[in-house]
Structures are given as structure tokens and as C-alpha cells.
Design a protein with these regions (language model features):
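An extracytoplasmic/periplasmic, membrane-proximal ligand-sensing/linker region
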Residues: 101-105, 142, 168, 190-251
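Conserved functional loop/turn residues at catalytic and ligand-binding sites
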Residues: 6, 11-14, 50, 66, ...
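Short glycine/serine/threonine-enriched helix-capping/active-site loop
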Residues: 19-20, 86, 151
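Hinge/capping helix and adjacent helix->loop/strand transition within the periplasmic-binding protein
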Residues: 9-15, 30-117, 166, 179-212
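C-terminal lobe and pocket-closing loops
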Residues: 51, 137-205, 234-237
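N-terminal (or domain-start) structured segment
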Residues: 1-41, 80-82, 104-133, 140, ...
């Protein structure tokens, strides 16, 4: 959020730009009592580049073979199941809270300092499930040490075609991903925005760039300035609502 704040208050010369994931823009301000910038007014959206989906995974020894079975287990053992996250307020923590709310289950959140320790405890059976970005989980999924029950994208991933979406699994509303975009200061001139937009568009048409992004499980989702502004507003509203419903206190 420090970098985002710096760009929000930077000169509009086109040299101070923010390449960012969605968290600092649409989650961070909603978790702060005194945010230093506003997602809707502090930036000039330039381009959305893509989104990285996330998996909900369980230990391979977990009896749940489907998302429905995990939900049934959570309802049968109300308040007993535990889920891990890389920390309070991370995008995947809020995805897990959104899953909890949409599936009407009661579970215990166990926050860690990073995804590595969280995954280690999931592998060790200390927690029951977690949601994490696809690139971090795919090696364990493909090796069989973790079982993916659902993916947050609108369609199945080619790298894990047997894993259904949340909607296919009976839990709609989880079509969310970690998005990446390019932003500038709010008063960045339109001609500068257009030059940068065209440069991003051209690069995303490069075959090598596309392959590199696909190898990192980035689903290219190119959108121009006005579309990005609407997307950011919608994304911010979703996480604000999730934070309120989950009773997560801003700090």
C-alpha cells in the first residue's frame, strides 16, 4: 500500500505508474480506518492485464472428495473445521470468507504469516482446507499431496481440467481472482493514458508474453481505462460487503 499511496500522490508526468495486484487497491482501503487513497478517485486506470484464479484445496487424506462433501462436513461439525490463510486481509482470506458466507457454514480461520507456513500445516493435517492462488498450489495438486475441490474462475483450468468451478459445485458468487493492472495518478493526461494503454495492448499480443503469462496461470483479461474503472468500483464494493458481512474490523 506504500507504493500505491506514492503513485496516488505523484506528479502526472507519466513516469510514476503502479503495476499492482488488486489487493492494495480494492481491499486495503476497505480494511483501513484512515486510508491514504481511494480506489475510485485516487488513480487513473490505464489497463487491466489479467487475473489469477485460486483453488480451494484439502489434504489428500481428507475424506472430502467434492466441495459439497466439505460443506456437509462443516455443517455436521459446526464450528470445528479450520481453514488456513496467508494472513488477515489477504485476497485469498477474503475469498475464503466469501465461501464461508455463501455456503452458510461456520468454520475457524487460522491466519499465518505467509502462504508457505499455511500450506505446511495443511499438508500436516493441522487445518482442514485453504484457498490460495493457483500457481502456488499446482505443484502439490499435480503431485497428489493436495486435492483441489474447486477453482474460483468462471471456467475450468487447462492445467487442472478435472477441478470444477465453485458455480459447478453449487456455490455461486465465487468467480473471483487476483487481478493485475496498470494505474497512474488520478490526473494523468488522456494522451498519456492512451500511449500506455496501446503499449500494454501490443505487448499482450506478443506470443512469447502470452505464453509466459499462461505458464504462470494468468488468464489474460485485457480491459481499457473506462472498463477498468468500472471493474475496480465493482471489485471494491464486493470486498467492502464481504468485510462487513464477515465482521472483519478495519485497523
Amino acid at each position: 500500500m506504500i507504493g500505491a499511496a506514492a503513485v496516488a500522490h505523484a506528479p502526472n508526468d507519466g513516469y510514476s505508474l503502479l503495476f499492482t495486484a488488486g489487493g492494495p487497491i480494492t481491499i486495503g482501503p476497505n480494511l483501513s480506518k484512515h486510508p491514504s487513497y481511494d480506489a475510485s478517485t485516487s488513480f487513473a486506470p490505464i489497463a487491466l492485464i489479467g487475473q489469477v484464479p485460486s483453488f480451494l484445496v484439502v489434504n489428500a487424506n481428507n475424506p472430502a472428495k467434492t466441495l459439497a462433501e466439505l460443506v456437509d462436513a462443516a455443517r455436521a461439525r459446526r464450528g470445528a473445521l479450520k481453514y488456513a490463510s496467508p494472513g488477515v486481509g489477504t485476497s485469498v482470506h477474503l475469498m475464503a470468507e466469501l465461501f464461508r458466507l455463501e455456503s452458510t457454514i461456520e468454520v475457524i480461520h487460522v491466519p499465518y504469516r505467509g502462504g508457505g507456513p499455511a500450506m505446511n500445516d495443511l499438508l500436516g493435517g493441522q487445518v482442514d482446507y485453504m484457498i490460495e492462488n493457483a500457481p502456488q498450489l499446482l505443484p502439490q495438486i499435480l503431485s497428489g499431496s493436495l486435492r483441489a475441490l474447486a477453482v474460483t474462475s468462471s471456467r475450468r483450468l487447462s492445467s487442472a481440467p478435472d477441478v470444477p468451478t465453485f458455480a459447478e459445485s453449487g456455490v455461486p458468487g465465487l468467480e473471483v481472482g487476483t487481478w493485475f493492472g496498470l494505474l497512474g495518478p488520478s490526473d494523468l493526461p488522456p494522451d498519456a493514458i492512451n500511449v500506455l494503454l496501446q503499449a500494454v495492448k501490443q505487448e499482450l499480443q506478443n506470443a512469447a508474453t502470452k505464453k509466459r503469462l499462461e505458464d504462470m496461470e494468468v488468464q489474460i483479461d485485457f480491459r481499457s481505462s473506462q472498463d477498468v474503472a468500472a471493474f475496480i468500483e465493482q471489485d471494491s464494493a464486493r470486498w467492502k460487503d464481504t468485510i462487513l458481512r464477515a465482521h472483519i474490523e478495519p485497523e
